[in-house]
Amino acid sequence: MLLHESAASMEQSMPENLSTHMYGECEVNPTLAKCPDPVNVDHELPTKESCASTTIVSTSPTSATSTTKVKLSFSVDRLLGSEPEESHRQSSSSPSTKSCCDGSILACCSFPHCFSQANAESRRFGHATLPPTFTPTSSHTYPFVGLDKLFPGPYMDYKSVLRPTPIRAAEHAAPTYPTLATNALLRFHQHQKQQHQQHHHHQHHPKHLHQQHKPPPHNSTTASALLAPLHSLTSLQLTQQQQRFLGKTPQQLLDIAPTSPAAAAAATSQNGAHGHGGGNGQGNASAGSNGKRKRSWSRAVFSNLQRKGLEIQFQQQKYITKPDRRKLAARLNLTDAQVKVWFQNRRMKWRHTRENLKSGQEKQPSAVPESGGVFKTSTPSGDGTPQEALDYSSDSCSSVDLSEQADEDDNIEINVVE
């Protein structure tokens, strides 16, 4: 039995597509082939099964060999699930018929390890066998079974045994990080939805919630284990946002959300207004404290030197060009936008002064383009006119006053013109 099983395993290990013993229980006649050495003989290469069967027949008596082979065929057929017809045929066969009938490779051999064993083994391993009606023709007139084992055919693809292996390995391989993150995100949303539903149920039915919360501890632990990479991502994002928020200066934070009263008081003291612009400065600070501030930048406070330089340039040209404005901003250590806004406010005040002089005052409009000192000395009379001239001088008020006064002048000018 060990010889038969080893022969069957040897047959299964080799590709059985075009092997000559596959189409019938064929065995090489011992009178034709005596298991020659494959080194000396190249074209006559009998199989190992034929050699094994030949040694069995030669070393034992005829009657004992027949009985033992009958018993072995019954036991092996019962183990491997072969057809009963083959076993009856093997049991009824005599020792003289247990070899090839005419010596051809497609003869009617009855040894159990030729075709029935290979057929049962192939059925057990799930390989396709050739239907019995198909009988291929062979051009060889002598038993030639060696080279057929070396060429695979279309009847049994031995690569099918190896093909599922990399697919299974790819399926069971460690998933990539994007796959983990996506799956964790989906599970996180489902978990949050379940918690939301349980929270709603807890508000309406608080007594039944304790019964519902007893089974889910295992689910919560598994969800926390699955959501570990997602929690690490969210914590990383939170730390980055905190670092971004803490990296800003207090002034930037004040510009973003000046809601506290201390910040409003600081803004009021910074924008502290003198003279006529005081009320408007406080109003803007209170509006900023309420979150209704329209401008996202704080108003700059110019020094006396900067105001004098701006005023001198304004007296020379009311409408400054872009190159001159950039040069002036670089010389006074200001930005281009600050110089532009200051000139706009100053022109608005200048127009307002001109409109007031045209409306009934005795002041000549030609005296206005000169410097502020000349303007103050040239006023002959009038109590309100010197005070208004002091408001327009560069030394008596800050740029905040000029900007606030520009807002008032803008409204007044619109009312007058329209």
Swiss-Prot record:
Tissue specificity of this protein: Expressed in cells of the visceral musculature and its anlagen.
Region (Disordered): 190-223, 259-296, 354-418
SUPFAM superfamilies in alphabetical order: Homeodomain-like (SSF46689)
This protein's record includes keyword DNA-binding: yes
DNA-binding region: 295-354
Alphabetical list of InterPro entries matching this protein: H2.0_Homeobox_TF, HD, HD_metazoa, Homeobox_CS, Homeodomain-like_sf
Disulfide bonds: none
Keyword Repeat found: no
Biased composition (Low complexity): 259-273, 391-403
Keywords per UniProt: Developmental protein, DNA-binding, Homeobox, Nucleus
Cellular component per GO, a single term: nucleus
Signal sequence extent: none
A molecular function (GO) term: DNA-binding transcription factor activity, RNA polymerase II-specific
Subcellular location as annotated: Nucleus
Biased composition (Basic residues): 190-216
Primary subcellular site in the record, as a coarse category: nucleus
PANTHER family: H2.0-LIKE HOMEOBOX PROTEIN (PTHR46808:SF1)
Biological role stated in the UniProt entry: May play a role in pattern formation during embryonic and imaginal development. Is not essential for visceral muscle morphogenesis.
Family, as annotated: Belongs to the H2.0 homeobox family.
Protein name per Swiss-Prot or TrEMBL: Homeobox protein H2.0
Naturally occurring in which organism (per UniProt): Drosophila melanogaster (Fruit fly)
